[in-house]
């Protein structure tokens, strides 16, 4: 009797196993064939991941699926799909995958960008928006005008543009974040900030760390997990700088992000180092990406002087030759606005952005997207989608005048979009408008056998994409403009009280004008 029962039970188990094997497979989006255990990892080493995914989008469609280790990954290759999923279904698609190296090891769970969607992230977001809402950003414009004046003055005397762009961007961020300008660009602070930026770029690069692909490895003892020691060194160095900057900021008499955020009731319940991180990564991220975009602008200017000439003619018509462009000119310079958008599209600084994670099962266009799937909106594939951007490899600002509704993916999507995007666009407007007012930009060639400008040669710097090294000549458009900039900077350097500019951003007691007392429009 027992033998009969055993045979029957075994037969039933075999039936269930066969039915399991024959079950309908989950209808994930199409993608390249996968190997057991590693999935598609073996296909990612020969080319940058953004290029490989663009090839797969051409082969399999605008929505593709990959397997990286044990993780399902869905990569989006069109702005419409990105809006449908990340914008319209933001409540479902706003979390983050498990960043073991970045979130758990290097930043101890303090980095806003790696937090899963939930109450803690919303708290971080509210604190960030207290200094990045449109009302505050508008009142930062005097600081941006002052810093941009120093930038164009420096470029009159050097063609080494990258350090000048980086100083300008970092000085804006540390000035507002901590009340500490970087007037020279060789301050100890800037070198430490650049080191930390480099670390963050590396830890956020998709597929860099084996422990992110196989999280169980993080349970190994430190002797067998050398990345833990690396992470601890990075964390200690980062938090030491953030603590020093915070102490300096709190000692300032002028307004800054640190003092504002520390004054919020919401910050009182958080560990002090978590608040230090919140401000620190705001200062770090903005300086890093803005500098890269200005490098990309310089490349575009050297390669396409005819497009810059159109923008210069527009600026000259509106501004004239006896003053610099200012924020009062924004609405009068549509071609310049289109040129800035095209710079962001043509060479995206972060071709993959930061991945999202879907929090519950979803279906899109007949495909099943399981909960926990990593979602990547590939800015590279989106920006070079010929259905949205005809002749996508052509640098053509006119496309944004012909269709003002063309998307801009540079700042991300949905609820995890960059909260500093309004400030970033203001920074790009004032710097690029003043550079074009002052200079013609041309390539520098040492000899006839020198290679051409690297229009499509890039260097992956962690999660950021930089143009391959190149040289450019910044020459004043005429002697009048050169003398004007020198005179204006001499006067500003002597008379402008920068701390007073910081204090004017949010007067004591919140004494804004009647117009500014209206509810500010916050970043989504």
Swiss-Prot record:
Question: What does the record's miscellaneous section state?
Answer: The various drimane-type sesquiterpene esters produced by the A.calidoustus drt cluster include asperiene C, asperiene A, (6-Strobilactone-B) ester of (E,E)-6-carbonyl-7-hydroxy-2,4-octadienoic acid, ustusolate A, ustusolate C, ustusolide E, ustusoic acid A, (2'E,4'E)-6-(1'-carboxyhexa-2',4',-diene)-9-hydroxy-drim-7-ene-11,12-olide, RES-1149-2, as well as the 3 newly identified compounds calidoustene A, calidoustene B and calidoustene C.
Q: Which compartment or compartments is the protein found in? A: Membrane
InterPro entries from the UniProt entry = Cyt_P450 (IPR001128), Cyt_P450_CS (IPR017972), Cyt_P450_E_grp-I (IPR002401), Cyt_P450_sf (IPR036396), Cytochrome_P450_fung (IPR050364)
Q: What is its EC number?
A: 1.-.-.-
Q: How does it sit in the membrane?
A: Single-pass membrane protein
User: Which Pfam families does this chain map to?
Assistant: p450
Q: Supply the PANTHER family for this chain.
A: P450, PUTATIVE (EUROFUNG)-RELATED, P450, PUTATIVE (EUROFUNG)-RELATED-RELATED
Q: What is this protein's name? A: Cytochrome P450 monooxygenase drtD
| Gene Ontology, cellular component aspect | membrane
Organism the protein comes from: Aspergillus calidoustus
The protein's job, in short, is: Cytochrome P450 monooxygenase; part of the gene cluster that mediates the biosynthesis of various drimane-type sesquiterpene esters, compounds that exhibit diverse biological activities and are widely present in eukaryotes. The pathway begins with the synthesis of the backbone drimenol by the terpene cyclase drtB using farnesyl pyrophosphate (FPP) as substrate.
Superkingdom of the source species: Eukaryota
The UniProt record lists the keyword Iron-sulfur = no
SUPFAM superfamilies reported for this sequence? Cytochrome P450
Q: Which residues bind heme?
A: 418
Q: In which pathway does it act?
A: Secondary metabolite biosynthesis; terpenoid biosynthesis
Note the PROSITE patterns from the entry.
CYTOCHROME_P450 (PS00086)
Q: Which GO terms describe its biological process?
A: terpenoid biosynthetic process
Primary site of residence: membrane
Question: What family is reported?
Answer: Belongs to the cytochrome P450 family.
Task: List, separated by semicolons, the cofactors it needs.
Answer: heme
């Amino acid at each position: 009797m027992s033998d009969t029962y055993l045979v029957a039970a075994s037969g039933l188990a075999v039936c269930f196993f066969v039915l399991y094997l024959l079950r309908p497979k989950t209808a994930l989006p199409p993608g390249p064939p996968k190997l057991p255990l590693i999935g598609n990892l073996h296909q990612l080493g020969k080319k940058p991941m953004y290029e490989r995914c663009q090839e797969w989008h051409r082969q399999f469609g605008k929505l593709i699926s990959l397997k990286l280790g044990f993780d399902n990954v869905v990569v989006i290759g069109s702005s419409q799909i990105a809006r449908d999923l990340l914008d319209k279904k933001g409540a479902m698609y706003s979390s983050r995958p498990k960043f073991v190296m970045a979130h758990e090891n290097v930043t101890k769970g303090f980095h806003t960008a790696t937090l899963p969607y939930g109450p803690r992230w919303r708290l971080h977001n509210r604190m960030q928006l207290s200094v990045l809402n449109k009302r505050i950003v508008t009142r930062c414009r005097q600081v941006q005008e002052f810093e941009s004046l120093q930038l164009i003055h420096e470029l009159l005397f050097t063609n080494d543009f990258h350090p000048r762009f980086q100083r300008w961007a970092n000085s804006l961020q540390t000035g507002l974040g901590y009340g500490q300008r970087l007037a020279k660009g060789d301050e100890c602070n800037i070198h430490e900030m650049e080191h930390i930026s480099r670390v963050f770029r590396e830890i956020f690069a998709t597929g860099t760390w084996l422990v992110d692909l196989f999280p169980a490895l993080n349970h190994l003892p430190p002797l067998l997990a050398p990345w833990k020691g690396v992470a601890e060194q990075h964390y200690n160095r980062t938090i030491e700088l953030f603590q020093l900057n915070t102490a300096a900021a709190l000692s300032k008499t002028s307004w800054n992000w640190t003092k504002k955020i520390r004054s919020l009731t919401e910050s009182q319940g958080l560990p002090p180092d978590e608040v230090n991180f919140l401000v620190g990564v705001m200062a770090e991220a903005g300086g890093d990406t803005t500098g890269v975009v200005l490098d990309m602008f310089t490349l575009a200017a050297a390669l396409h002087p005819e497009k810059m000439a159109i923008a210069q003619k527009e600026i000259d018509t509106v501004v004239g030759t006896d003053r610099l462009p200012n924020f009062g000119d924004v609405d009068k310079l549509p071609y310049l606005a289109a040129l800035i958008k095209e710079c962001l599209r043509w060479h995206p600084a972060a071709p993959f952005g930061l991945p999202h994670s879907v929090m519950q099962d979803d279906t899109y266009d007949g495909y099943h997207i399981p909960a926990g799937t990593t979602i990547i909106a590939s800015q590279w594939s989106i920006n070079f989608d010929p259905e949205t951007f005809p002749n996508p490899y052509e640098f053509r600002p006119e496309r944004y005048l012909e269709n003002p509704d063309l998307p801009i993916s540079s700042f991300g999507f949905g609820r995890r979009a960059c909260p500093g995007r309004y400030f970033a666009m203001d920074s790009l407007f004032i710097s690029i408008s003043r550079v074009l007012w002052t200079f013609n930009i041309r390539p520098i060639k040492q000899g006839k056998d020198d290679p051409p400008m690297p229009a499509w040669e890039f260097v992956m710097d962690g999660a950021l994409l930089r143009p391959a090294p190149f040289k450019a000549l910044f020459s004043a458009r005429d002697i009048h403009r050169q003398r004007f900039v020198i005179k204006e900077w001499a006067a500003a350097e002597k008379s402008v009280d920068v701390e007073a500019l910081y204090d004017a951003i949010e007067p004591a007691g919140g004494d804004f004008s009647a117009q500014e007392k209206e509810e500010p429009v916050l970043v989504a």
